[in-house]
Design a protein with these regions (language model features):
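N-terminal Rossmann-like dinucleotide/flavin-binding domain of flavoprotein oxidoreductases
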Residues: 85-155, 231-242
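Glycine-rich nucleotide phosphate-binding loop and flanking beta-alpha elements
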Residues: 58, 138, 168-170, 208
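Glycine-rich beta-alpha-beta "Rossmann" dinucleotide-binding loop(s) and their flanking helix/strand
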Residues: 152, 160-189
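Active-site acidic short loop of glycosyltransferases
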Residues: 158-159, 196
């Protein structure tokens, strides 16, 4: 644990939209109630907050920081909400737990991927939030503040840091011959691409089952390979559809 640095979103171990939004907002709320934290004190080049990542958790933190009037900067390596943008076409959205209202201002109503993207954009980008496109290589503690190292840029200094980079880029490899083939994918963009093709989906979580269901519905012949005899991780709706 590093005082003043907060990890939010998927990296906390719960990859659900509402939990991601909740952790982002609560991190900033915790900063605001921290008796040690003093905003806008000391050198003007030191920001109150730096947010790394512009996914659901990072954007939720940004909304909370702006509402509180903090000086902040947000960095995103690819594009805002990249994980959601890269969901399969027309992927169904389940906002579990249904009764949960996450901390902060971000809300979820959409039931398919495209509507969710539009909904998220409307709540953030359309409201003037503009993350800086840059990859943060590392974060170092320097006394009472942090320094963010960014290639080809001057280091950025901040009193507090929120890390919401997600886990979508860290896909697990099987360690088997042939997995580097052009026929092997770690993400499904459009299931229509697999019409009338034989497809092996490896995995037993929601992503794997949703990919298998979508490909089958679009005319693909699908086999699911899972290391357990039963599915216990996916949502009941996905198991029923399979």
């Amino acid at each position: 644990n590093i005082s003043g640095l907060y990890v939010v979103g998927d990296l906390t171990g719960i990859p659900l939209l509402k939990f991601s939004a909740d952790t982002g907002a609560r991190a900033v709320q915790h900063i605001l109630t921290d008796g040690v934290f003093q905003r806008d004190k000391g050198p003007v080049e030191i920001m109150d907050l730096a947010i790394v990542g512009a996914g659901v958790s990072g954007m939720s933190a940004t909304l909370e920081a702006r509402k509180a009037g903090l000086s902040f900067v947000q960095f995103e390596a690819t594009e805002p909400f990249s994980t959601v943008v890269n969901f399969p076409k027309e992927k169904p959205i389940y906002t579990y737990p249904t009764e949960m209202v996450p901390a902060g201002d971000m809300r979820f109503v959409a039931q398919i991927k495209e509507s969710l993207v539009a909904e998220l954009y409307e709540q953030t980008l359309a409201q003037g939030i503009e993350p800086t496109l840059a990859r943060v290589e590392r974060v170092e503690k320097r006394g009472d503040h942090f320094e963010l190292h960014i290639p080809d840029r001057e280091n950025v200094k901040a009193r507090r840091v929120v890390i919401g980079i997600g886990r979508s880029g860290n896909f697990r490899k099987l360690g088997v011959p042939g997995e580097d083939s052009v026929k092997v994918f770690n993400r499904l963009h459009d299931p229509v691409d697999f019409d009338d093709k034989d497809v092996l989906v490896v995995g037993g979580g929601d992503s794997a089952l949703e990919a298998a269901i979508a490909i089958a519905q679009c005319g693909g012949r699908v086999t699911v390979s899972y290391r357990e005899p039963d599915f216990f991780r996916p949502k009941p709706e996905n198991v029923e559809k399979l």
